[in-house]
């Protein structure tokens, strides 16, 4: 089974890739290297004994996302970690964040709709906004 990990060379993504490979999945990493390093591939290989397939793709480019799924037709799941998360930068440059966090998600989902058997896991931003009035935080807040 082919599993795609977007943002797969980032901290959380690379650890996820290691775990997936360790249990036998064929992992395809998509990363645009804007906040990661190609050197992480070597680290994954040292840990697991196998380097994942790597595609340097900017998910904001719809045609690139379409071409990826045309090339890899056996994908059965996507774990989506590719997103921007810096609050200050998002206020200074909101359009970049809309493109990276929303448009790229939409392009992925449009392609996955063509594969009803595929599963999708979305990892939301690690940044939490606001101050909690009460702890623990309830599901209803």
Where do the PLM segments sit?
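N-terminal Rossmann-like NAD(P)+-binding domain of SDR-like oxidoreductases, especially those catalyzing
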Residues: 1-141
């Amino acid at each position: 089974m082919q599993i795609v990990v977007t943002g797969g060379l980032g901290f959380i993504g690379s650890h996820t890739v290691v775990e997936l490979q360790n249990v036998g999945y064929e992992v395809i990493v998509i990363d645009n290297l804007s906040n990661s390093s190609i050197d992480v591939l070597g680290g994954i290989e040292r840990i697991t004994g196998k380097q994942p397939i790597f595609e340097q793709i900017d998910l904001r480019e719809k045609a690139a996302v379409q071409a990826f799924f045309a090339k890899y037709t056996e994908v059965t799941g996507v774990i989506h970690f590719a997103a921007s998360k810096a609050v200050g930068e998002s206020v200074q440059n909101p359009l970049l964040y809309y493109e990276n966090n929303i448009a790229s998600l939409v392009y992925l989902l449009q392609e996955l709709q063509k594969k009803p058997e595929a599963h999708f896991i979305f990892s939301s931003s690690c940044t939490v906004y606001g101050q909690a009035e009460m702890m623990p935080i309830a599901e209803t807040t």
